[in-house]
Curated annotation (Swiss-Prot):
It comes from the Bacteria. This is Protein-export protein SecB. Homotetramer, a dimer of dimers. One homotetramer interacts with 1 SecA dimer. The gene is secB. It is found in: Cytoplasm. GO terms for biological process: protein folding; protein tetramerization; protein transport.
Amino acid sequence: MADDNNSNGAANPTLSILAQYTKDLSFENPGAPRSLQARDKAPTININVNVNANPLSDTDFDVVLSLNAEAKDGDKTVFHAELTYGGVFRVAGFPQEHMLPVLFIECPRMLFPFARQIIADVTRNGGFPPLMIDPIDFTQMFAQRVAEEQARAKVQAVPN
């Protein structure tokens, strides 16, 4: 008896990581060794996150997660960590309308724990407590990105 679960002939969706890599890593501690002394209050930490995806073939994609963490004490930079962490993913069998969510939500979600650990290690190795970045809501990030692109398209479509 034939398997009727796949009657349209499409392959079962698969998502696999073929490779992971650190593309760029930078850590700056401009005030060392003074920045390593005890302080009255914790520095303000700002974290920026970005995700990009580029096709390598019909099924393989390079997904890059960029994390930028900057700690400031007033107007002085305490430390600045930047990481560009990538993964080569094989994405096959998904309907076309699911490709962008897979690339911009699921792939970075798989990369994040590794990137988070690298940032924690580099801040610890820089003389500070490890910076443990809170989990990131990639679904919300993707929704915001789509909304911004739609708003930009509306502005460009309006005649002057």
